[in-house]
């Protein structure tokens, strides 16, 4: 009876809160690719942080951890000329969205993503930015001690250049000179949303985190929309099945990815023939391998080098009408001290766009970070 009285009192005094809580319980709000509602996010993040701090007290200093970004400025005339020269010869066999201009459009995301790492992850040893003979306008000499540009030709065999295929570029991350064994891979549309400890990515004993999504690859295929990422992940599963008894059906969350250089070397040793088979693909095709975002993380897991961990990442398409509400939510969460771990402001399909989608993104990033 007391419980009913409290509910009735809440209805009378704060009807808007009563109905909000009722609807949230009946229809939970989800912002992530995980099986958790918005009401659970803050508790999950707090629990992870407390556990990381306990581990910190019981371990020695972490090994070096680097960060790697891949970046392209699709508005660069030199890059456009190169793309126009090669792309027409490969478009016929390219995969869904592979030639969509949204994949190469630069909204200055890299500036915010890199500076978020510098602000919220000061323990990172070094940041490497992989480019195709390009340099971010904001990168000056004062940052060179912490940030190094890596050109495609520094790590990718010349016979595969130029390439406009991120899957190919990601297959050579381990070739970066002076890269640490443990590193975190970022696309430039992934942003750190709060302070994160090294233990969120790697334990002091070397075990990496693998941020697995609740999504299903088989259900994606059943929908009939065969993306290059889906095909490349399925191909990766077939390779993994040659060495392990697996039932993999889960992709990773769209966020940063902890990786190990030694696991890259193992993959090349085991799967060299399959790798060499897709490297000539200058655009994404349906016979690529999903290296950094799937093959290596799952290889690390089956080799006992990684274990599942939760990352609360808000994932959305910046051209979608839903982006506006997500921007407002991110800023509100920050004011409340309930920020997610990260967010991914994805841009891959230019067929439909809300007005001012770019300005909306930049305005939100400016308000969020205030760099």
UniProtKB/Swiss-Prot annotation:
Keywords: Exopolysaccharide synthesis, Transferase. One of its GO terms (biological process) is polysaccharide biosynthetic process. Disulfide bonds: none annotated. The keyword Acyltransferase does not apply. It is an enzyme of class 2 (transferase). The keyword Transferase applies. Its EC number is 2.7.-.-. One of its GO terms (molecular function) is transferase activity, transferring phosphorus-containing groups. Part of a capsular polysaccharide synthesis locus. Belongs to the stealth family. Stealth proteins are part of a protein family that is conserved from bacteria to higher eukaryotes. Family members were first identified in microbes as proteins that help pathogens to elude the host innate immune system. Microbial stealth proteins are involved in the biosynthesis of exopolysaccharides. Stealth proteins are predicted to function as hexose-1-phosphoryltransferases. This is Capsular polysaccharide phosphotransferase cps12A. It comes from Actinobacillus pleuropneumoniae.
């Amino acid at each position: 009876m007391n419980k009913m009285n409290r509910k009735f009192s809440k209805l009378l005094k704060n009807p808007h809160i009563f109905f909000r809580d009722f609807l949230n319980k009946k229809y939970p709000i989800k912002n992530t690719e995980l099986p958790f509602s918005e009401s659970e996010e803050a508790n999950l993040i707090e629990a992870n942080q407390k556990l990381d701090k306990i581990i910190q007290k019981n371990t020695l200093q972490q090994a070096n951890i680097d960060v790697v970004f891949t970046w392209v400025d699709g508005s660069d005339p030199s890059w456009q000329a190169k793309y126009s020269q090669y792309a027409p010869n490969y478009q016929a066999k390219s995969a869904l969205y592979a030639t969509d201009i949204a994949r190469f459009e630069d909204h200055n995301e890299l500036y915010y993503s890199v500076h978020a790492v510098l602000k919220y992850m000061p323990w990172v040893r070094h940041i490497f930015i992989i480019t195709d003979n390009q340099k971010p306008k904001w990168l000056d000499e004062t940052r060179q001690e912490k940030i190094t540009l890596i050109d495609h030709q520094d790590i990718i065999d010349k016979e595969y250049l130029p390439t406009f295929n991120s899957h190919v570029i990601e297959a050579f991350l381990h070739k970066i000179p002076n890269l640490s064994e443990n590193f975190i891979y970022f696309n430039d549309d992934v942003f750190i949303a709060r302070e994160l400890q090294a233990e969120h990515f790697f334990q002091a004993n070397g075990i990496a985190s693998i941020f697995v999504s609740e999504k299903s690859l088989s259900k994606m295929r059943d929908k009939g929309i065969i993306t290059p990422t889906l095909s490349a992940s399925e191909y990766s599963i077939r390779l993994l099945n040659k060495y392990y008894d697996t039932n993999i059906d889960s992709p990773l969350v769209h966020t940063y990815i902890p990786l190990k250089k030694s696991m890259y070397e193992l993959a090349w040793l085991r799967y060299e023939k399959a790798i060499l088979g897709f490297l000539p693909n200058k655009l994404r095709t349906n016979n690529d391998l999903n290296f950094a975002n799937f093959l290596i993380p799952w290889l690390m897991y089956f080799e006992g080098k990684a274990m599942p961990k939760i990352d609360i990442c808000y994932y959305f398409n910046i051209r979608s009408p839903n982006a506006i509400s997500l921007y407002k939510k991110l800023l509100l969460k920050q004011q409340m001290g309930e920020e997610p771990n990260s967010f991914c402001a994805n841009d891959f399909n230019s067929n439909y766009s809300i007005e001012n989608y770019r300005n909306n993104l930049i305005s939100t990033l400016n308000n969020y970070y205030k760099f």
